[in-house]
């Protein structure tokens, strides 16, 4: 008898005798739409029970709002978990960091009562830096596009990731090393950008003096976060990752080119923190009870009417980072099925259900159709195709009563429960929480 017959096939052997390297898993919170779903509130809710909260990608183009003990905190680079003084917050290697903005954010939130950050914030030495000239270039590139702009935040995120991809970016660790080498690299990257964009003006010596000071300020926070996280997992520490932006803004899977410059899906968690796939535990998709989008780009369920105005007003849909009004529309099931395929949600948190309280009926997109009437079995891969689809809606009854004070799922109006169950059924993913207000106490546990 052959060895393979005795011990199984090679594939079966591959899965035998696995050793468990890690004592804990990494749970992930991801935006399931175009951002602004309420990820920060979900992270804040879960962070009270975890040891470490991480940001893995993006920069200060993200905006998360957390209400804790009646105080509203706005975060752009800091993980929302910093509100919990018992956990460590990590800014991973996949994040791009504008140091002036980071320290401004720290000061503003310290003024609101945030304390002892120096003991519980860790920044990756491999994270890339965003410089002021990146921001200037971002604004210039948007202006050059005229009416075809992408609607970026002009925070320099795209140009910084571009520097990273072309291998002339500068990482935090280089700022803390030999400053002469940092100075040479900085002069080189400035020269490259001035050559490409002659109108930008950079006072190199003034910037170097400024960054010499920033080196001293940031030094106490910087570590090898990859080693830190793997050690934590081996020791059974609980880790939560806060995704920035959202799946439909992902550079690969979003509505390209109307996207951000990083991977905001599950893959970005792994590359942005240096984690292998087997460390991932729960993947929580955060879904707003309707759909919003900031900036330009296709939006199949957008409502340019009284419904859109009502959602914008009741939901106070204004961007935390951009201060722009968000575009509003109905919940989009085909979009959510697509992002669930990409991210593999194990459960969902529905937020802002209370914003729908006044509506007599609520529409939900259930299918996309070609102009011929044929239903699409996939999410369109180009904006041209997405802009040419027709949307098929299901019409569900509203509940026309306030849900803001409800704290038990079974006490929600029957039609509100049905709305949540409809979403759950369509996606075949359990809804674990429902949000009906701003504070952490307004999140209802469904199961």
Curated annotation (Swiss-Prot):
It is found in: Cytoplasm. Plays an important role in the de novo pathway and in the salvage pathway of purine nucleotide biosynthesis. Catalyzes the first committed step in the biosynthesis of AMP from IMP. Its EC number is 6.3.4.4. This is Adenylosuccinate synthetase. The keyword Magnesium applies. Pfam families: Adenylsucc_synt. The keyword tRNA processing does not apply. It catalyses: IMP + L-aspartate + GTP = N(6)-(1,2-dicarboxyethyl)-AMP + GDP + phosphate + 2 H(+). Its main location: cytoplasm. InterPro entries: Adenylosuccin_syn_GTP-bd, Adenylosuccin_syn_Lys_AS, Adenylosuccinate_synth_dom1, Adenylosuccinate_synth_dom2, Adenylosuccinate_synth_dom3, Adenylosuccinate_synthetase, P-loop_NTPase. Mg(2+) binds at residues 36, 63. Binds 1 Mg(2+) ion per subunit. It comes from Drosophila erecta. NCBIfam families: PRK01117.1, purA. IMP binds at residues 36-39, 61-64, 153, 167, 245, 260, 324. GO terms for cellular component: cytoplasm.
């Amino acid at each position: 008898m052959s060895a393979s017959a005795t011990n199984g096939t090679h594939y079966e052997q591959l899965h035998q005798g696995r050793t468990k390297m890690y004592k804990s898993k990494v749970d992930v919170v991801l935006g399931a739409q175009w951002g602004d779903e309420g990820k920060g509130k979900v992270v804040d809710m879960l962070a009270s029970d975890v040891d470490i909260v991480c940001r893995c990608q993006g920069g200060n183009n993200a905006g998360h709002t957390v209400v804790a003990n009646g105080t509203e905190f706005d975060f752009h680079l800091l993980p929302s978990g910093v509100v919990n003084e018992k956990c460590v917050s990590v800014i991973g290697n996949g994040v791009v960091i504008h140091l002036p903005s980071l320290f401004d954010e720290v000061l503003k939130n310290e003024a609101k009562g945030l304390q002892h950050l120096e003991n519980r914030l860790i920044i990756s030495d491999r994270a890339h830096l965003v410089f002021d000239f990146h921001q200037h270039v971002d604004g210039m590139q948007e202006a050059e596009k005229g009416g075809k702009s992408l609607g970026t935040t002009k925070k320099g995120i795209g140009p910084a990731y571009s520097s990273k991809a072309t291998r002339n970016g500068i990482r935090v660790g280089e700022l803390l090393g030999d400053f002469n080498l940092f100075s040479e690299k900085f002069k080189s990257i400035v020269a490259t950008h001035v050559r490409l964009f002659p109108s930008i003006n950079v006072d190199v010596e003034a910037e170097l003096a400024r960054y010499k000071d920033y080196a001293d300020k940031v030094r106490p926070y910087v570590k090898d976060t990859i080693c830190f996280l793997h050690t934590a997992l081996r020791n059974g520490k609980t880790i939560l990752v806060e995704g920035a932006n959202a799946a439909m803004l992902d550079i690969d899977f979003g509505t390209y080119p109307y996207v951000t410059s990083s991977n905001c899906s599950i893959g970005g968690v792994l590359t942005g923190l240096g984690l292998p796939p087997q460390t991932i535990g729960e993947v929580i998709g955060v879904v707003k009870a309707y759909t919003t989008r900031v900036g330009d780009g296709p939006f199949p369920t957008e409502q340019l009417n009284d419904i859109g105005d009502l959602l914008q007003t009741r939901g106070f849909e204004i961007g935390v980072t951009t201060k722009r009004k968000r575009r509003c529309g109905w919940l989009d099931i085909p979009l959510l099925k697509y992002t669930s395929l990409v991210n593999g949600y194990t459960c969902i948190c529905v937020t802002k259900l209370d914003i729908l309280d006044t509506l007599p009926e609520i529409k939900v997109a259930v299918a996309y159709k070609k102009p011929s009437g044929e239903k699409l079995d996939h999410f369109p891969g180009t904006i041209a195709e997405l802009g040419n689809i027709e949307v098929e809606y299901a019409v569900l009854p509203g509940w026309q009563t306030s849900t803001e004070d409800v704290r038990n799922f079974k006490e929600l109006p029957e039609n509100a429960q049905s709305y949540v169950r409809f979403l759950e059924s369509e996606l075949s993913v359990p809804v674990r929480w429902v949000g009906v207000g701003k504070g952490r106490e307004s999140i209802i546990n469904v199961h």
